[in-house]
Amino acid sequence: WLSTLLKKRGLKMINNQVDIGVRVETSDIVMEEINKHLYEGKFIFNASVGTRVRTFCSNPSGYVVLENHSGIMLANGHAYSDPNLGSKNTNFAILVSHVFSEPFDKPNEYAQAISRLANNLSNGSIIVQKYGDILKGRRSTEKRIKEGFIEPTLKEAVPGDLGLVFPYNTMKSIMEMTEALNHVTPGLASEHTLFYGVEAKFYSERPQVNDRFETEISGL
């Protein structure tokens, strides 16, 4: 509503960023030090391709869940306050910030298109893939998921290949972040770690303002 109103007044709106990535699931044991001392560690990494990557929304002893975003299925996660309801896994997001330049001005639609692709490849759900399969460039299968050390907490996720979903720079950024985090919490880059995709964070348009938060219209 606000965007529509401001556009009618001829104001320039800004929103050229969207965050796209995966929900990572590993064991509580791997994340024990971070969970114990920080609960939710915040890590930021600059990938070799120039993207900014961050961790977000860590859930110790949590569960990966489906999020319905206007008909698009996305990955997300949560944890219960009651420890008796917890799982043996920790999940968190790895998100790659995509900042676009002119003439492109539809970042949210870009992320939606990538998310829909994952939905189509998983027949309406999201994809889960072992990190070891990502490194080998092959899709995960139900058999290989079951043989892994990490039991998926989201049973509706469909084994597949996130390499068919993400653009090259996005996937490379996610993998570089995973390897960097492995130095912080060894074992995270294990072949058994699970990646669910797509997770995305969308941003609203905002009016262009000066250093006093004024728009191009005097008094507004």
What function would you assign to each model-found segment?
Residues 1-220:
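Residues forming the flavin
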